């Protein structure tokens, strides 16, 4: 399908891992390389109003080819890959006509197994693109990037009726910064879709409310032999804090619409310890209750400490559940569902146990649910995507454009 696989393999060959804790946006030079490549390809494709901002947001417009009062719509993907696993020297494997069983990843002992990933049972006969076991693949979200670029080529090359189509490619989605610098007014779409989901048929308009919790613990270190009544062990205080967090409300014990507390990192000495939690919940009231719970725990554990020893807690909201914004515009979901059905796909409405750029954009005035890409097992060496799933995503993007043109 018009260079879809070729595009994808080219994009994943570029190391675009984002980096947390960096003030600049994009956080890595590799993202600029892909953004500049995409800008060049958009120019060659004949799109107009192409801009690449100093914060790494690439925007372009495919002009309407029919007259009428047709709303401008957008499609958005991010160019960065997760900092959770290496994205350098990605070497994809192409497994044609998958016949079941384990897939060897490279020459080591790593395998992609249907025992661990039962979804493979549903993909018999398809073409799978996997890693070699040493890196992530980057289907999150270079599959989405390739699908949008291919859909533009299909729309333009086949003279399919459509209104004005806006596209954008953003940096640093994986570290939560890309959408913060997105100029919604300049983009000019009435609504948009991120192409950043998973398996075929997924249509997502609900995501977590999210916050980060950073805890600084200052203790007092003296020689252990003379420590009685004097030492305040910051590590012990950290352990007490975590012991107060509900053990059955962690990522590994929750699913569906259940929220959680997640201790993402902890480091320290007797003198000083630092803890980093993330809090997630779909329900806004429960989300606020979780934040209060963390404050209460810190206050309880810190009670009675020497004045020079203390526990400092900082909570920062990251993003909110876009449901409350998207449901105000039900036609956006209706069009996407109809497009899927027209492509012989059963829409699967499911909550995102995470976030997307669309969550932030929805609260910035651009309602933005999430479409599937055909990818699975993101952020690790078992990541893979199906070529058939990617082709279906292209078909859905094209069909959404067609259906929107009929809405006038």
From Swiss-Prot:
This is Peptidase T. Keywords: Aminopeptidase, Cytoplasm, Hydrolase, Metal-binding, Metalloprotease, Protease, Zinc. SUPFAM superfamilies: Bacterial exopeptidase dimerisation domain (SSF55031), Zn-dependent exopeptidases (SSF53187). GO terms for biological process: peptide catabolic process; proteolysis. Cleaves the N-terminal amino acid of tripeptides. The active site is at residues 80, 173. InterPro entries: ArgE/DapE_CS (IPR001261), Bact_exopeptidase_dim_dom (IPR036264), Peptidase_M20 (IPR002933), Peptidase_M20_dimer (IPR011650), Peptidase_M20B (IPR010161). Zn(2+) 1 binds at residues 78, 140, 196. The gene is pepT. Zn(2+) 2 binds at residues 140, 174, 379. It catalyses: Release of the N-terminal residue from a tripeptide.
């Amino acid at each position: 399908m018009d260079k879809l696989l070729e595009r994808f393999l080219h994009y994943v060959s570029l190391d675009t891992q984002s980096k947390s804790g960096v003030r600049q946006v994009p956080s890595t030079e590799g993202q600029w390389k892909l953004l500049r490549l995409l800008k060049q390809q958009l120019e060659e494709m004949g799109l107009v109003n192409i801009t690449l901002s100093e914060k790494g947001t690439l925007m372009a417009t495919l002009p309407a080819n029919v007259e009428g009062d047709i709303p401008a719509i957008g499609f958005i993907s991010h160019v960065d890959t997760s900092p959770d696993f290496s994205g350098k020297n990605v070497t994809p494997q192409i497994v044609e006509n998958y016949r079941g069983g384990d897939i060897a990843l490279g020459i080591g002992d790593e395998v992609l197994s249907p025992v661990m990933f039962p979804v493979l049972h549903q993909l018999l006969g398809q073409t799978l693109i996997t890693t070699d076991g040493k890196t992530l693949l980057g289907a999150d979200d270079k599959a989405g990037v390739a699908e949008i670029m291919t859909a533009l080529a299909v729309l333009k090359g086949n003279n399919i009726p459509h209104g004005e189509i806006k596209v954008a490619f953003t940096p640093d989605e994986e570290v939560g910064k890309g959408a913060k610098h997105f100029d919604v007014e300049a983009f000019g779409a009435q609504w948009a879709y991120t192409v950043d989901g998973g398996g075929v048929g997924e249509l997502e308009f609900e995501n977590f409310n999210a916050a980060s919790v950073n805890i600084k613990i200052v203790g007092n270190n003296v020689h252990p032999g003379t420590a009685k009544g004097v030492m305040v062990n910051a590590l012990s205080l950290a352990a007490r804090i975590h012991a107060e967090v509900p053990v059955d409300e962690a990522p590994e014990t929750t699913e569906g619409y259940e929220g959680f507390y997640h201790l993402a990192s902890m480091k320290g000495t007797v003198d000083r310890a630092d803890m980093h939690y993330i809090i997630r919940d779909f329900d806004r009231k429960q989300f606020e209750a979780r934040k209060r719970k963390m404050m209460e725990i810190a206050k309880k554990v810190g009670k009675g400490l020497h004045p020079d020893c203390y526990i400092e807690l900082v909570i920062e909201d990251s993003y909110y559940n876009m449901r409350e914004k998207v449901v105000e515009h039900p036609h956006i979901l209706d069009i996407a569902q109809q497009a899927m059905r027209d492509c012989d796909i059963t829409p699967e409405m499911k909550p995102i146990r995470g976030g997307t750029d669309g969550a932030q954009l929805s609260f910035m005035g651009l309602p933005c649910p999430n479409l599937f890409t055909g990818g699975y097992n993101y952020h690790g060496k078992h990541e893979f995507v199906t070529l058939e799933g990617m082709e279906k995503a292209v078909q859905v993007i094209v069909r959404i454009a067609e259906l929107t043109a009929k809405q006038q």
